[in-house]
Regions:
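A conserved beta-strand-loop-helix scaffold within acyl/acetyltransferase catalytic domains
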Residues: 152-204, 252
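C-terminal appended segment following the main domain
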Residues: 216-260
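Short amphipathic alpha-helix that is part of the acyltransferase structural core
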Residues: 1-20, 55-56, 61, 110-111, ...
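Conserved beta-hairpin
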Residues: 31-36, 88, 94-105, 170-183
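N-terminal charged segments
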Residues: 1-76, 91, 154, 164
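A conserved beta-turn-beta hairpin within the catalytic core of GNAT-like acetyltransferases
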Residues: 46-53, 107, 189-197, 206
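Acyl-donor-binding surface of acyltransferase catalytic domains
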Residues: 62-138, 232, 239, 255-259
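Conserved acetyl-CoA-binding loop-helix of GNAT-fold acetyltransferases
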Residues: 64-72, 201, 207-220, 224, ...
Length: 260
């Protein structure tokens, strides 16, 4: 799909890698740690993941080991699951190796982009997708938590904050199969792109077109509002191959590390 309106390849890559760093919506207990070459989130109330991450790290080689150790120890002491993104602009060059030596586990990720023009849907009437509001946020949160193996309580509290946010940049989507809740996804809207995240389909409903339908619904949301591009950080082993078949272009590959 065309993404030719961007002037340079660097501009496209920045939209994929830098813009999503501002996708977070902080909870009252979220600590945002930001300085030149560093962006980190710490949220003690979300122990199983979410708003606990190093989103950007460009470290001086001489201080890298100390910063890595301090960061890992912070999350360990608080008992938090976290992630560390090692994108193309991360430093030092061997940052991924340093994290791996400390026992963090990587998964390969594709930074992808697509225009928001529509894709054909073949799921039929059995599959529906709806935007989530106050009436369905509990059902959405329960489905998301089941899909990701998380406690639904903190997730629901966060999602209620999302739908109540006056900025309205974050949107939640619930997919159903024959009326049963079966999958979830979300997006964050920026000026030139929407950032896709949180897509999951429950195992019992996979292979029925629900993931495609969630992608299509979010593309339609963006297109109707004149937002020309969609971006995503997709797992190489799961969603990236599907998204490539749906017209997303991979601009870069990079690891994201987790502590379990």
């Amino acid at each position: 799909m065309s993404t030719g309106d961007f002037t340079t390849a660097d501009e496209r890559l920045r939209e994929v890698m830098e813009t999503p760093r501002r996708a977070y919506l902080p909870l009252p207990d979220t600590q945002v740690i930001e300085r030149p070459g560093w962006l980190q989130l710490v949220t003690p109330s979300l122990r199983q993941g979410g708003l606990n991450e190093v989103a950007f790290s460009a470290l001086d080689e001489r201080e890298a080991d100390a910063v890595i150790d301090e960061t890992i120890e912070l999350y360990r002491r608080l008992g938090l699951r976290f992630r560390w993104t090692v994108g193309p602009d991360s430093r030092p060059a061997d940052l991924a190796e340093r994290l791996a030596r400390r026992g963090l586990l990587p998964f390969e990720t594709h930074g992808m982009i697509r225009g928001t023009e529509a894709i054909p849907i073949e799921a039929g009437g059995d599959v529906t997708v709806e935007e989530v509001g106050e009436r369905t946020v509990e059902e959405f949160s329960r489905t998301l938590a089941e899909g990701w193996g998380m406690d639904p309580g903190p997730i629901e509290a966060f999602n209620r904050l999302v739908i109540a946010s006056p900025a309205g940049r974050h949107r939640l989507f619930l997919a159903r199969y024959r009326s049963a809740p079966a999958g979830t996804a979300s997006l964050v809207a920026f000026e030139r792109s929407v950032y896709f995240l949180g897509g999951v389909v429950l195992p019992a409903f996979r292979g029925r077109g629900l993931y495609r339908a969630l992608v299509a619904a979010r593309l339609r949301y963006a297109a109707e509002r004149g937002i020309p591009y969609a971006t995503i950080h997709a797992r190489a082993s799961t969603s990236a191959p599907i998204l490539e078949r749906l017209g997303f272009e991979t601009l870069c590959r990079f690891p994201i590390f987790t502590n379990g």
